[in-house]
Amino acid sequence: MAKQSMKAREVKRVALADKYFAKRAELKAIISDVNASDEDRWNAVLKLQTLPRDSSPSRQRNRCRQTGRPHGYVGKFGLSRIKLREAAMRGEVPGLKKASW
């Protein structure tokens, strides 16, 4: 089980990424625009650097919804491999069954 502070930190990162998404996209568009002047591009880089570090989506980590475990995350279900197996064995995941051949 992950610490509550780690789970809260991830929630904070998601909220910050949502809040600054439009501004970050606008600045990145200016930076990647080849027709923009060098000065405009440089100013956009400086403004992008002033945004909060946690507002970047690449800072987010996928975590299990039940335990907060960061490793062994199965994105389709939002659970770690351990909790997914437990749920599947109890028959709580529709259409998922143990392989047998």
Swiss-Prot record:
It comes from the Bacteria. GO terms for cellular component: cytoplasm; small ribosomal subunit. Gene3D superfamilies: 1.10.287.1480. Keywords: Ribonucleoprotein, Ribosomal protein, RNA-binding, rRNA-binding. GO terms for molecular function: rRNA binding; structural constituent of ribosome. GO terms for biological process: translation. Belongs to the universal ribosomal protein uS14 family. Part of the 30S ribosomal subunit. Contacts proteins S3 and S10. Binds 16S rRNA, required for the assembly of 30S particles and may also be responsible for determining the conformation of the 16S rRNA at the A site. HAMAP family: Ribosomal_uS14_1. This is Small ribosomal subunit protein uS14. It comes from Citrobacter koseri (strain ATCC BAA-895 / CDC 4225-83 / SGSC4696). The gene is rpsN.
